[in-house]
Regions:
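Short, solvent-exposed beta-strand edge segments and adjacent coil->beta transition regions
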Residues: 38-40, 93-95, 115, 145-147, ...
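N-terminal pre-triad scaffold of radical SAM enzymes
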Residues: 25-79, 96-105
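Conserved AdoMet/S-adenosylmethionine-binding subsite of the radical SAM
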Residues: 128-279
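Short, conserved beta-strand segments within well-ordered enzyme catalytic domains
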Residues: 42-44, 90, 149, 177
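Auxiliary Fe-S-binding modules of radical SAM enzymes
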Residues: 1-37, 244-287
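Iron-sulfur cluster-binding cysteine motifs and their immediate structural context
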Residues: 53-60, 79-98, 108-124
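Fold-independent oxyanion-binding glycine-rich loops
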Residues: 28, 46, 58, 100-101, ...
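Extended, non-globular alpha-helical segments
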Residues: 69-75, 122-137
Length: 287
């Protein structure tokens, strides 16, 4: 049975929320220009409830630290195997096999690899530590209209940590943005929106059956989150990934158009990627 956001607590399955003391991230990307206006720092949270077949950041799906092996870098030294105290690694003709039940993410294999072919993805960090990294570029935010964007993964799966980080940024005068997939618990979203100066939401497929098949979750909670965000009184960017033959079809774009006209407010100043041109030139649809 597929879980729904309503059945989740703020510490959702796959979440590592511990009350805000620390969070699990897989990247802090400085000088980001695609995750909101201006120059931004994007904090990528680990843990995502979706299972998109085209996932762009699969390392962000699991809520815990995990290993990534890069076959093009591997020189077959096997030092990583010798370094692993749990025997979680096996290198054969088909490549590296990682026993993820055994692996505890200690990182000894990464330290031992002479070619940098194996890496631990994910690190525990306090909200204060994350804020200090974000604050380094405060001058760039001030001069470009940028700020912090919290993305993922799905940031609402670690709401206490994200709330503390956003609060610290707001106290320092750094604008904040929440980038969500929309499949999230209502209480988590409602907790974070008041701390957000803008929101970004991904609307991928508007067909219920295809959404369930290709995204792995029901569509209704995503549409409900879009409606909640549209009434939050903050600017919103709607984003749609371009997946040929899937999200870029006339039918899907028309359905996205319907959602836009149903929920759009003056606070929705930008709709990006494939639907932008259609929305700019078409008449309001009869849905």
């Amino acid at each position: 049975m597929r879980s729904s956001p309503e059945s989740r607590t703020s510490s959702s399955p796959g979440s590592v929320d511990d009350g805000g003391r620390t969070g699990t991230i897989f990247n802090i990307q400085r000088f980001s220009i695609e995750d909101g206006p201006g120059i931004r720092t994007t904090v990528f949270m680990k843990g995502c409830p979706l299972r998109c077949v085209w996932c762009h950041n699969p390392e962000g799906i699991e809520g815990r630290k995990q290993l990534m092996w890069f076959d093009v870098r591997c020189i077959g030294a096997r030092d990583c195997l010798k370094a692993c105290p749990l025997g979680a690694l096996e290198l054969g003709k088909d490549g590296m096999r990682i026993d993820r039940e055994r692996c505890d993410g200690c990182g000894l294999c990464q330290e031992a690899c002479p070619a940098g072919a194996i890496e631990v993805v994910g690190r525990r960090i306090t909200a204060r530590e994350a804020f200090e990294e974000v604050a380094r570029d405060e001058a760039f935010y001030r001069n470009s209209g940028g700020g912090l964007t919290v993305s993922g993964g799905e940031p609402t799966m670690q709401p206490a940590f994200v709330a503390e980080l956003m609060g610290l940024c707001r106290e320092a005068g750094i604008p904040t943005a929440l980038d969500t997939c929309g499949y999230c618990a209502d209480d988590s979203l409602e907790r974070l929106l008041p701390l957000s100066d803008m929101a970004l939401i991904d609307l991928k497929l508007m067909d219920e059956a295809k959404h369930l098949e290709l995204i792995g979750v029901e569509l209704a909670p995503v549409k409900r989150s879009a409606a909640t965000i549209s009434h939050a009184g903050i600017p919103v960017w709607v984003r749609t990934p371009i997946i040929p033959g899937c999200t870029d079809t006339d039918g899907n774009i028309a359905n996205l158009e319907c959602v836009y006209y149903d929920d759009a407010r003056p606070e929705w100043p930008r709709v990006v990627q494939c639907a932008e041109a259609l929305w700019a030139t078409s008449q309001q649809p009869h849905c």
